[in-house]
UniProtKB/Swiss-Prot annotation:
<feature type="binding site">
    <location>
        <position position="139"/>
    </location>
    <ligand>
        <name>L-ornithine</name>
    </ligand>
</feature>
<feature type="binding site">
    <location>
        <begin position="515"/>
        <end position="517"/>
    </location>
    <ligand>
        <name>FAD</name>
    </ligand>
</feature>
<feature type="binding site">
    <location>
        <begin position="115"/>
        <end position="123"/>
    </location>
    <ligand>
        <name>FAD</name>
    </ligand>
</feature>
<feature type="region of interest" description="Disordered">
    <location>
        <begin position="1"/>
        <end position="25"/>
    </location>
</feature>
<feature type="binding site">
    <location>
        <position position="200"/>
    </location>
    <ligand>
        <name>FAD</name>
    </ligand>
</feature>
<keyword id="KW-0547">Nucleotide-binding</keyword>
<dbReference type="GO" id="GO:0000166">
    <property type="term" value="F:nucleotide binding"/>
</dbReference>
<feature type="binding site">
    <location>
        <position position="310"/>
    </location>
    <ligand>
        <name>NADP(+)</name>
    </ligand>
</feature>
<keyword id="KW-0503">Monooxygenase</keyword>
<feature type="binding site">
    <location>
        <position position="354"/>
    </location>
    <ligand>
        <name>L-ornithine</name>
    </ligand>
</feature>
<comment type="function">
    <text>L-ornithine N(5)-monooxygenase; part of the gene cluster that mediates the biosynthesis of at least 11 siderophores, including beauverichelin A, dimerumic acid (DA), Na-dimethyl coprogen (NADC), eleutherazine B, ferricrocin (FC), fusarinine A, fusarinine C (FsC), metachelin A, mevalonolactone, rhodotorulic acid (RA) and tenellin. This cocktail of siderophores for iron metabolism is essential for virulence, and more specifically for the fungal virulence in penetrating through the host cuticle. Siderophore synthesis is also involved in conidial germination under iron-deficient conditions.</text>
</comment>
<feature type="binding site">
    <location>
        <begin position="324"/>
        <end position="327"/>
    </location>
    <ligand>
        <name>L-ornithine</name>
    </ligand>
</feature>
<dbReference type="InterPro" id="IPR036188">
    <property type="entry name" value="FAD/NAD-bd_sf"/>
</dbReference>
<keyword id="KW-0274">FAD</keyword>
<dbReference type="Pfam" id="PF13434">
    <property type="entry name" value="Lys_Orn_oxgnase"/>
</dbReference>
<comment type="pathway">
    <text>Siderophore biosynthesis.</text>
</comment>
<dbReference type="GO" id="GO:0004497">
    <property type="term" value="F:monooxygenase activity"/>
</dbReference>
Length: 536
C-alpha cells in the first residue's frame, strides 16, 4: 500500500470478520456474522456498530431507492457491493434527493447489489491497530461530487457526535478502522438493496430483439445453500475487486500460507500463543508488507521475522502535491485519449506513487529497529531476530510437519543466483503480493461473440492499456471500455439503454486511480449519468 493504495475491492471471502473498534488498541477479535440470505426482508431501520464508543444508532434506509421484486427486471445490477458500488448507490440517492428523474415516469430505478461476502466489509484483513488512511477524508464517497451530501465523512462524524473532537486531531487522515466504519454506516442505508452471500459466476445475454441484446442475465451462487439464482437487468456493473495474487513458487494451497488480505483475522487463529518464538516470513515490498512485518513484531515480541523482497531496499512513496495531481478526477480525461504507448509509459513512470512503496514514517521506524539490532547484536544479520532481505526471491516452499522450509535465492541484476542460497524455517508465510483484477474477462465469456475483432496482438495490449484480447471460435476479439467505462460491443449488438460497465479493472486506460478510493465520488456521478442519461 502506498499513500493512495486504499483500494476499492473486497478481497476477504470469510464468514467471520474482525469487530472494528476505532480505538485500535488490540488485535481484532473474531465475531460471528449472521448470514443474509435472499429471502431475508430488510427492516425499516438498520443499526450499525459505531466503533468509537460501542453505541448503536438506528440508520434509516434510503427512501429514494426501494427494494424491487427479485424475479423482475432491474434497471441496474451491480456485481460486488464494495466502495465502488456503494458510491454508485450514494450517487443514485443524491440524484433522486435533488429532485431529478432517473426514469421517464419519475419512479425509483430498480437496483440490485450482489455481494459474495456475508456483509459489507472493506479490507477487513488489514485493519491493523494504529493504521491510518493514506488519502484525505475529503476524497470520501460523496464530497468531491456534492459536499452537501448526507454521505460525506464529515456528516458521518457529525451523526456520531465526533466532529469537533476529530477536528482537534488536526489531520486529514482518519484511522483506517474509523473510515471502514464510515463506509459501513453508508452501506447500512442500502442494505435492503443488497443480496449478500451471492457470488456471481456469469453474465449472459438474456433477451434479444433483432440480434440486439435488450436484457442480461446474471447467475449467482448462494454461498449458504449452494443454489444458483438468475437475476435479470438491462445494465450490469462489474465491481468485483481483486483476487489475491501469490508468487508462482508458492504451493497452490496451504493452511500456513496466507495472503495479506487475510492477515488480521487469520493470524490470531494460527499463531495462538502471544509469547511463543514463532518464525514468520513476509513477502513483498509495499505498504502492506511493511505494516505486517512491523505488526508481527509488536503482537509476538519473541518472534523472529523476515521480510523477503525482490527490491534491494524499501522505497518511500511519492505523495508530493504535483505528483498527486495524477489522482485528480480530471486527469482521467487527460490520460484516456493518449496512445497505448503513452499510457504504458505513464504507468511505469507513476509506479512510485502506488506500487512497491512505503510511507516514509514507517520506513524510518523499521530502519531504527534494524539499526538497534546491529548496535546490540553486531553486523551479521543472520543473528538478528528481524531481517529485511532485499534482492531475494523465494524459489521453493516445502511443508515439514507444522512448519515450512523456505528456500531463498539472491538476485543479481534480476536473475536468480543459484550460489546465493539460504533456507529458512517458518511457522507462517504471509504474501503481501497484490491482486489480480481480471475476473471480469471470464465472467463475460458468453458476450465475447459480440465484441469487435481484435487487431493482431501487441505487447501494449497485454498490459490492458487498450483492453484485453480474448479467443473465440470466430477468432480473437477485443474487450475494451470507453471513457465512461462501458464495454465496447459491436455496433447494434446491445441496445442503447442497456450495457455492461467495468469498475476497478481499467487502470491501463483510466489511470492509477481506477482501483483506488480517490475518484469514487466523481466517478459514481459519471456512472449514473452514463447509465441513466440526462434528467427526463
Amino acid at each position: 500500500m502506498s499513500p493512495h493504495r486504499e483500494t476499492t475491492g473486497d478481497e476477504s471471502t470469510t464468514t467471520t470478520v474482525p469487530q472494528n473498534g476505532t480505538n485500535g488498541a488490540a488485535a481484532p477479535e473474531l465475531v460471528a456474522v449472521p448470514t443474509n440470505g435472499a429471502a431475508v426482508k430488510a427492516p425499516e431501520t438498520l443499526a450499525v456498530q459505531n466503533g468509537a464508543n460501542s453505541r448503536v444508532k438506528p440508520i434509516q434506509r434510503s427512501s429514494h431507492l426501494v427494494a424491487a421484486d427479485l424475479d423482475g427486471e432491474f434497471d441496474l445490477i451491480c456485481v460486488g457491493f464494495g466502495p465502488a458500488s456503494l458510491s454508485v448507490a450514494i450517487a443514485l440517492h443524491d440524484t433522486l434527493a435533488a429532485g431529478k428523474k432517473l426514469r421517464p415516469d419519475g419512479s425509483s430505478p430498480k437496483v440490485l447489489f450482489l455481494e459474495k461476502q456475508t456483509r459489507f466489509a472493506w479490507h477487513a484483513g488489514m485493519l491493523l491497530p494504529g493504521a491510518k488512511m493514506q488519502i484525505s477524508f475529503i476524497k470520501d464517497l460523496a464530497t468531491l461530487r456534492d459536499p452537501r451530501s448526507h454521505f460525506t465523512f464529515l456528516n458521518y462524524l457529525h451523526q456520531h457526535d465526533r466532529l469537533v473532537d476529530f477536528t482537534n486531531l488536526s489531520t486529514f487522515l482518519p484511522a483506517r478502522v474509523e473510515y471502514e466504519d464510515y463506509m459501513r454506516w453508508c452501506s447500512a442505508h442500502f442494505e435492503h438493496l443488497a443480496q449478500y452471500d451471492h457470488e456471481v459466476v456469469s453474465v449472459t445475454p438474456a433477451v434479444k430483439k433483432a440480434d440486439t441484446v435488450k436484457l442480461f442475465a446474471v447467475e449467482a451462487r448462494n454461498n449458504v445453500n449452494g443454489q444458483v439464482q438468475t437475476f435479470r437487468g438491462r445494465n450490469i456493473m462489474l465491481a468485483t475487486g481483486g483476487k489475491p495474487s501469490f508468487p508462482k513458487s508458492f504451493p497452490v494451497k496451504h493452511p500456513r500460507i496466507l495472503h495479506s488480505s487475510q492477515y488480521a483475522y487469520m493470524v490470531p487463529q494460527i499463531l495462538t500463543d502471544k509469547n511463543a518464538a514463532y518464525k514468520v516470513v513476509v513477502v513483498g515490498a509495499g505498504q502492506s508488507a511493511a505494516e505486517i512485518f512491523h505488526n508481527i513484531q509488536n503482537l509476538y515480541p519473541n518472534s523472529s521475522t523476515q521480510l523477503v523482497m525482490r527490491q534491494e531496499f524499501l522505497k518511500p512513496s511519492d505523495d508530493s502535491p504535483f505528483v498527486n495531481s495524477i489522482f485528480n478526477p480530471e486527469y482521467i480525461d487527460a490520460l484516456f485519449p493518449k496512445s497505448a504507448k503513452g499510457r504504458s509509459e505513464f504507468l511505469v513512470d507513476a509506479r512510485a506513487t502506488n506500487y512497491g512503496v512505503v510511507r516514509l514514517e514507517l520506513i524510518e521506524e523499521l530502519f531504527e529497529r534494524m539499526y538497534a539490532q546491529k548496535r546490540v547484536l553486531g553486523p551479521d544479520e543472520r543473528t538478528w531476530p528481524h531481517r529485511i532481505m532485499g534482492c531475494r526471491q523465494i524459489s521453493n516452499i516445502e511443508p515439514h510437519g507444522d512448519r515450512l522450509e523456505v528456500k531463498i535465492h539472491g538476485l543479481s541484476d534480476g536473475v536468480v543466483n543459484s550460489a546465493d542460497e539460504e533456507i529458512l524455517s517458518a511457522d507462517l508465510i504471509i504474501a503481501a503480493t497484490g491482486y489480480q483484477r481480471n475476473a471480469h474477462i471470464d465472467m463475460l465469456k458468453s458476450t465475447w461473440e459480440m465484441l469487435p475483432k481484435a487487431v493482431p496482438g501487441t505487447a501494449m495490449f497485454n498490459k490492458g492499456v487498450t483492453g484485453w484480447n480474448v479467443d473465440t471460435e470466430q477468432g480473437e476479439r477485443k474487450l475494451a471500455v470507453g471513457r465512461d467505462y462501458r464495454v465496447q460491443y459491436k455496433a447494434g449488438s446491445v441496445a442503447g439503454d442497456a450495457g455492461i460497465w467495468l469498475q476497478g479493472c481499467c487502470e491501463g486506460t483510466h489511470g492509477l486511480s481506477d482501483t483506488l478510493l480517490s475518484v469514487l465520488a466523481t466517478r459514481s456521478g459519471e456512472m449514473v449519468q452514463s447509465i441513466f442519461g440526462t434528467e427526463h
